[in-house]
A protein has these predicted regions:
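Broad, structure-driven detector of short, well-ordered beta-strand segments within folded domains
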Residues: 17-23
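Acidic, Ser/Thr- and proline-rich intrinsically disordered linker/docking segments
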Residues: 2-15, 27-30, 34-89
């Protein structure tokens, strides 16, 4: 499987404008404080597991013992996000 293959995509909510899962990374397009946008990349080798799903937010554990939070469009999209993540890990 190519590293640019798209496994999951959601338009996100709040500051998160686009959430994508690829075979080796999670890409998030975030809206900045002053209206700008930037892409944040989290590599899957740094993710140790899913901490919890609360509503439409997904909390992931990483190696630094800090939480990565992703806000998706709906609770069902959050569950699909976790399922796609479990498929890759």
């Amino acid at each position: 499987m190519d590293n640019n293959t798209l496994l999951f995509q959601d338009k996100g909510s709040g500051r998160f404008k686009d959430v994508k899962i690829h075979p080796n990374r999670i890409e998030v397009l975030k809206k900045g404080t002053f209206g700008g946008k930037h892409t944040e990349i989290v590599y899957l080798k740094d993710i140790t597991g899913v901490n919890r799903i609360k509503g439409r937010d997904v909390f992931l554990r990483n190696r630094l013992l800090t939480a990565c939070v992703f806000s998706l469009n709906s609770r069902s999209q959050a569950q699909e996000f976790v399922n796609a993540l479990n498929m890759v890990m």
